Amino acid sequence: AASSDRDISSLAEIMAGGAARPPDQVGKISSTFKRASPGIGYGLTETNALGAVNAGAFYVANPRSTGRVVPAVTDFRITGEDGKTMPAGERGEVCIKSPANVVGYWNKPEATAEAFVDGWFHTGDVGYMDDDGFVYIVDRIKEIIIRGGENISCIEVEAAIYSHPDVVEAAVFGLPDERLGEIVGAAIVLREGAQMTAEALREYLAEHLASFTLPAHVWFRSEALPRIASGKIFKRQLKADYAAELAGAR
């Protein structure tokens, strides 16, 4: 957009939400646009989109964080499996209390009782908060890959993949494995004209990630990754398609 002939002088902010933005994209936005600053928000339908916000210089300095809690109207806490609040830096489930929270799910009393406890909405997201109050979303609880007992965040692996200059789109997901339970799979779209092998990708990622988190299976696609109506990548479809492909190859 910055290199086009369109007049974007009135553009003041470039906000994102619904999914993590590749960290290096934040710096590119800041350096490319003279006036517009990047930002990201975290919230859910159940909280009427209220949660945390990261914008401007704070976001550029801390691009992996979804920001600080929206003041006055929102309380945040990170809880462990025992329901107790986790200390700074420790991962757990993100819970939000706010007068903007919905009261429950229509005609779904069991789901309501599970998600809304003592005024706190249990988001189903894994995250943590640092000593300065910045919130970090690690992944959905349901999307954490458990490989041989080790927890792997899809979002963290995706961030490492996106740091490669030839990567345009990436999605990471768990695939069934008889020995380890789950293994890491990745679907990737490269920039036009770029070429890469799975082994070359793993060598690059090994400089940024623990060895057990590296993708065991990598698919390079010529077409864009499928997306749902909200614009999020349709991981469930990718996971089903590639799991079926692997099962058929056995």
Question: Model-flagged regions — what are they?
Answer:
Residues A1-A61, P71-D75:
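Gly/Ser/Thr-rich phosphate-binding loop
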Residues G18, G43, G67, D125, ...:
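Active-site glycine-centered loops adjacent to acidic/histidine catalytic or metal-binding residues
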Residues G39, V218-R221:
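General small-molecule cofactor/ligand-binding pocket signal
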Residues D24, K28, E93, S98, ...:
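AMP-binding/adenylate-forming catalytic core of the ANL superfamily
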Residues E13-A16, V172, W219-F220:
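Hydrophobic/anchoring residues in structured secondary elements
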Residues A20, N54, V60-N107, A115, ...:
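Adenylate-forming AMP-binding core of the ANL superfamily, especially NRPS adenylation
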Residues A240-R250:
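Acidic/polar alpha-helix N-cap and adjacent early helical turns
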